[in-house]
Amino acid sequence: MAYRELKQKHRALREVFHTNLSLRTHRALSWLDRAEQSAGDLDAQFIFLWIAFNAAYATDIDEQYRSTEKGMFESFFKKLVDLDSEDRLYHLVWAEFSSSIRVLLDNQYIFQPFWDSHNGKVPEDEWKQRFQLSKRKAANALGNRDTVQVLSVVFRRIYTLRNQIIHGGSTWSSQANRSQLNDCTALLFKVIPVLIDLMMDHPEQLWGDAFYPFLADD
């Protein structure tokens, strides 16, 4: 399911949606559309897809929690997986992207403590210990087919890649990060339409106030 089909569904249902859900999905779909139009520019596609994800899940939260955005992923994915009666997210994780996910989880360049060590914030042995611990936890989640935990860990890694690009820590179209960028973009292209669709399928759920709500006089 891609932008066009999802947008038709949104137009058909938005009148019965809460304003916050309608705004979230409208914004997310606009960025998904832009990502689909950016074929040939992997960096742009990744950025637009991340914005689409952010538009769908982010809520207006306390400043102290906003600085730990990564901590929000698990509760969001748990809600989606619980609502996913057709196991679409399960299928994506365990059928389509199982190999790619294992590669991503073994990639130190999208593990934030690696860069913290490189920048002198933590000792080298500390990031290595944390990396091994993270991989063991991920392996346990993979072994237990824990879709929520696997998606949460993967999106924390994607978040690090997002930071590298958004904060100017990467060169456009650089070969240095192509492997992880390819894998992350492919995963986002499949996961984001599913999560938008699940949200629209469940307007009765509380999805939270929209981040930066629309103001008529803006």
Sequence positions of predicted segments:
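Helix-loop junctions and short alpha-helical segments
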Residues: 1-20, 49-141
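Polyanionic, low-complexity intrinsically disordered segments
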Residues: 4-15, 19, 117-218
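Short amphipathic alpha-helical segments and their helix-coil junctions
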Residues: 22-40, 138
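Non-catalytic, well-ordered alpha-helical scaffold segments
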Residues: 29, 43-50, 74, 98, ...
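Short, hydrophobic/amphipathic alpha-helical patches that form generic packing surfaces
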Residues: 30-37, 47-58, 157
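Short, surface-exposed loop/turn segments at secondary-structure junctions
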Residues: 39, 64-67, 172-178
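Short secondary-structure junctions and interdomain/linker hinges
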Residues: 39-42, 59, 87, 111, ...
